[in-house]
C-alpha cells in the first residue's frame, strides 16, 4: 500500500498557495520588462532627438483645446446677440404690421361707404400718428439689424483661431509621422518612398502643377525620398505600418 506523501518543513506545498506566488513573480517580471523597454525607448528617442517631436506635439494639445473653447464661447455669444436682437425687433415689426393693416381696413371701409366728418377726422388723426411713429419703429428695427450684422464679427476672429488649430493639428501629425518614419525598417522606408514618389508623380500629371503637392504635411527636409507631401501619402504610410 502506498504511503501518503507529506510535505516536509522545507518543501513547497502542492496546493493552490504556490500559484499566487508564481503569478506575482511573473507579474513582477512583466512589469520589470515593460520598465526596461520604456527606459530603452525613452533613451533612444532622446539620443535621436525624437523626444522633442513628441514633446512639441503634446504641448500643442492643451493650446488647441483652449482655442476650441474660445471658438465655442465666441459662437455662443454671437448666437445670443442675434437671438436677443430678433426678440427685440420682432415685436416692433409685428406692431407696425398690425397698425398698418388696421388703418388700411378702415380706409377701405371709408372709401366703400363714406362716413361723417368727425369719424373721418379721427381716421386721419390715427393715420398721421401712425406715420409719425413709423420712423422710430424702423430705426429700432434697423438698430437690431445692425446688431445682428455686428454679431457676425466672431467669424473673422474664430476663423483665425480655427486656422491656428489646423496648423497645430498639422504640427502634431508632422511630429508623430517623423517619429514613425525615422524608426521603421530601411526596407519599409524605401518602399514607402517609392509609393510616395509614384503618388507625387501621379498628382503632378493630374494637376499640371507640382505646387499642389505642398498642401500636405512634410515630415522630412526637401530633397529627401521620405517626404510626405499630401494626405494620401500620410494614409499610405500609416497603412504600410499597420495602423
Curated annotation (Swiss-Prot):
Pfam family membership, one: CheZ
InterPro entries, per database record: Chemotax_Pase_CheZ, CheZ_family_phosphatases
Organism: Burkholderia multivorans (strain ATCC 17616 / 249)
A GO molecular function held by the record: phosphoprotein phosphatase activity
Protein name (Swiss-Prot/TrEMBL): Protein phosphatase CheZ
EC number(s) from the headed UniProt entry: 3.1.3.-
Subunit details: Homodimer.
Keyword Hydrolase on entry: yes
CC terms in the record's Gene Ontology section: bacterial-type flagellum; cytoplasm
Amino acid at each position: 500500500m502506498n504511503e501518503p506523501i507529506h510535505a516536509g518543513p522545507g518543501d513547497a506545498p502542492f496546493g493552490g498557495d504556490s500559484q499566487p506566488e508564481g503569478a506575482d513573480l511573473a507579474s513582477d517580471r512583466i512589469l520589470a520588462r515593460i520598465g526596461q523597454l520604456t527606459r530603452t525607448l525613452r533613451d533612444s528617442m532622446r539620443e535621436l532627438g525624437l523626444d522633442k517631436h513628441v514633446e512639441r506635439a503634446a504641448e500643442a494639445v492643451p493650446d488647441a483645446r483652449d482655442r476650441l473653447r474660445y471658438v465655442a464661447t465666441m459662437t455662443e455669444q454671437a448666437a445670443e446677440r442675434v437671438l436677443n436682437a430678433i426678440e427685440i425687433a420682432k415685436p416692433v415689426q409685428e406692431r407696425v404690421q398690425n397698425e398698418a393693416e388696421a388703418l388700411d381696413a378702415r380706409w377701405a371701409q371709408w372709401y366703400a361707404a363714406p362716413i361723417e366728418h368727425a369719424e373721418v377726422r379721427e381716421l386721419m388723426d390715427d393715420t398721421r400718428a401712425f406715420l409719425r411713429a413709423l420712423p422710430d419703429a424702423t430705426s429700432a428695427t434697423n438698430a437690431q439689424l445692425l446688431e445682428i450684422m455686428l454679431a457676425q464679427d466672431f467669424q473673422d476672429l474664430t476663423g483665425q483661431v480655427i486656422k491656428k488649430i489646423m496648423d497645430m493639428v498639422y504640427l502634431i501629425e508632422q511630429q508623430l509621422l517623423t517619429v514613425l518614419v525615422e524608426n521603421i525598417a530601411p526596407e519599409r522606408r524605401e518602399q514607402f518612398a517609392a509609393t510616395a514618389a509614384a503618388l507625387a508623380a501621379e498628382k503632378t500629371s493630374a494637376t499640371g502643377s507640382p505646387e499642389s503637392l505642398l498642401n500636405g504635411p512634410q515630415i522630412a527636409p526637401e530633397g529627401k525620398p521620405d517626404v510626405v507631401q499630401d494626405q494620401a501619402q500620410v494614409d499610405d504610410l500609416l497603412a504600410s505600418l499597420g495602423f
